[in-house]
């Protein structure tokens, strides 16, 4: 038997219907579903529960299957179509199936997938349920509870035709529907079930089961004063659908649920006895407690297949149960604080009692404020010469060679270095000029800067000293005037010395730049990486530094004639001749340039010492005055303390 695919096409768009809506009781193609259930157009229709049509039922089996399997499959489809007709013709259900049907997911009742369709709930409490439904947790493809069959007699009004058993303790025991009789044309055995369900059996049992169903219906009508609310309970069936259609319907679903289910049409040969026993138990009208126990067993079993109708006493009680289960949904745990990589900042306490009682956002804010304060403290200012340079505190990165943090203890750990060696690298930030042009340019800039500093000090120094000496502003003013005039005289001298020193540096490093570019001298240090020597504080220190520089440059200039060619041979092993001639050129050029550089640097260092001598003398005098004043204050404090005390002779007693 083959179904006519043309009967399954949408008349409006001429496309295959792939979606079924329980609330609308209709089939839709992808475009129709977008128009009907768009969240922007109609908020209520967007809450309708919809499922993908079972493509295995629509398309049919492959032609390569055996004849026995084809016959079995044809019988299944015929049985499906009969059930569809019975559902449609049943007067107890009505034209719209969903109005009297409660839809449930195969998940547990406390699962976020436990959801009701909006049209199946009373209008006065509709909003309470829909507000608590998490729209981000829609039913996923694997959790889709719908199985759709096709009515070949009427292609325009297809109905939901097959469901599975799932009963919760909150619902009474399910009873077989009078509209769903056993099919007389099928020999398919149903899968084993622990609760009463309509099954496919042989022709000899079909008539007795129909009579039992009719008797059961009469008993239910006589026992209830109000009309029974018939509900259809669905359980999951694996749905086969296109990926784009799944995205359209289930775009907000959780796609990582690994729940597997067997097909509705997986039957075992040994299930006849169990199914007959279950039907007999149902026909004998067991008490409600036994029925509830059977419902519990059904909810945990994996048996699938069959259609059930359950009668409920009051709809409001079940709605309250749904609300409670939605409210009791477990909340996800709070996110822990993110781990921060190792840095020079304080580590966050992991097991602190104080942190446990604080909110995670507040804790993160506290740590961020502490880190910002530490970053501000790491920025340190140091004055060198006339201007000041800002550089990163070398002690902020207290790491040893292995990458670990250094401790604050006095003893040096393994792999650590003395802090004095680190600090010495930052006493001066200026690097030597690598050639003569750079030396002249930097020297000219330094000369102009010192002149500007000296002239501005005439005005700035009196103001600064008045602010610093609030107790005696007159004294501070004249002190500032003296410093300003002294700076105006010494700053140009200091600028001239800086120009000479920079020029000497560039001249000394020119040969290395021209021939090699690596700026390495005999000691193995890079001239460009050498830190500038500290300034001479007085004239004698300037003369001493200048003499040392002159002697060093004379020595390097003379010995370089021999040592530079040897170095060229060692460095350039691939082309020793090239290295040799480079060394010869570097040595000859250094023999002329380096002594000249030493003479210029000696003059510059001497001028630097002369310029700094007045400041050194003034600072020494101020320090002596401060020391005397501090000593006098200490003596006065001791005298005042001694006057308040009385001497007691211990021998007087």
UniProtKB/Swiss-Prot annotation:
Zinc finger (B box-type): 5-49
Binding site residues for Zn(2+): 10, 13, 32, 37
Chief localization: membrane
Record's bilayer topology term: Peripheral membrane protein
Keywords tagged on the record: Membrane, Metal-binding, Zinc, Zinc-finger
Segments of skewed composition (Basic and acidic residues): 314-330
Subcellular location: Membrane
Compositionally biased tracts (Acidic residues): 266-277, 366-381
Region listing for Disordered, in residue ranges: 159-232, 248-420, 627-653
Signal peptide: none
InterPro entries: VPS13, Znf_B-box
Biased composition (Low complexity): 195-213, 278-293
Gene Ontology CC, one term: membrane
Recorded GO MF terms: zinc ion binding
Family: Belongs to the VPS13 family.
Protein's job: Mediates the transfer of lipids between membranes at organelle contact sites.
PANTHER family: INTERMEMBRANE LIPID TRANSFER PROTEIN VPS13, VACUOLAR PROTEIN SORTING-ASSOCIATED PROTEIN VPS13
Protein name as it appears in the record: Intermembrane lipid transfer protein vps13l
Species annotation: Dictyostelium discoideum
Taxonomic lineage from the root: Eukaryota, Amoebozoa, Evosea, Eumycetozoa, Dictyostelia
